[in-house]
Amino acid sequence: KLICDTVFRVPPERREIGLMFQDFALFPHLSVADNVGFGLKTGTKAERRARIEELLERVDLLRFIDGYPHQLSGGEQQRVALARALAPRPKIMLMDEPFSGLDNRLRDDIRDETLGILKEEGTAVLLVTHEPEEAMRMADEIALMRDGKIVQQGAPYNVYTRPVDRASVAFFSDANVLRAEVSGALAHTVFGRFLAPGVPDGTQVDIVFRPQHLRIDFDRAGKGPLPTSTDGTAARAVVARARFMGNESLVEFVMDHDGSTLRATVPNVFLPQPGAVMWLTVRRDRCFVFPVHAAG
C-alpha cells in the first residue's frame, strides 16, 4: 500500500499501521478499556466494546478492564499496549524494542505470548531490536542494518550460518578473528589452510569463527606437543582467564604464535587455571573468510 510519494500522502492516522512503543506510552488518565479502544474509530459502541473485551481476554487482562495503567505491572502494561495497537486491525505493526523494559524471565514469557497473539491475528510485524536472541526467537525473516542500510536479509538460520561480513557474525555472538594472507586461493593460518576462492593472491583476509567453534583438545591439555595433523590444524595456547557463565564456561586464551587472544565456550563447568597450556583446533566448516576491506 502506497502511503507517500512526491505528490501523494496518506495522513498517519489513516495508514492502518499499529505502533508499539519501547516505553508502552499508555495514557495514564484513561482506563485500560479506553486505552485499548483509543484507535477504534469505526463501528457501533457495542462493536467497539466487544473488540476491547476480545483483546483484553486474549492478553488475559479482562479483569483489569476498568483499571488504570498505574495499577498494572510492567508486563501487564506491555500487554495493554499490544492490545491497543492491535485493536483497529492494522495491516502492519511497528514494534520499537517493546520488551527491553522487562526483566529477563518476564521478557521471555511476554515475547512468546506476544508472538502467539500476533500469529493468531495474522498481522505482519516489523520489530526493531538490538538483541540477537530476540531476533532469532521472534522473526520469520531478519534484516541486519548498518549505517541506515540493510546489509543482509533472510531467514534466521541463513543469516546466522551464512553471514556476509565480519560484523554480521558479531551481531549474533562474540567473534574470534584470525588475520591471514591469501596465496593460491588459500588463507594460511596457525590452524591450517582455509579456502578463499576468488580472492587474489596477497589479499589480507579475516577468518572469523564463534567461540563455540574453538575446540580444546582435552586429551592433550597440559601435556607435551601435539603431533601436527596433515593440514596443521592444532595450535598451542595459554589460558589467560576462565569464567563460569551459568550454562557454559568462557575461556580466554593467548595464542603462542603471535600473542593474540581467542575465546572458547565450553558446556557446563570448565575453569582451568591461568597459565595452563592447551591445544586448540577450530571447526573448519564453521569458519568464514572475508577480505579485510569487506570485514565490516
Where are these regions (language model features)?
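C-terminal boundary and immediately downstream tail of ABC-type ATPase nucleotide-binding domains
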Residues: 161-183, 208
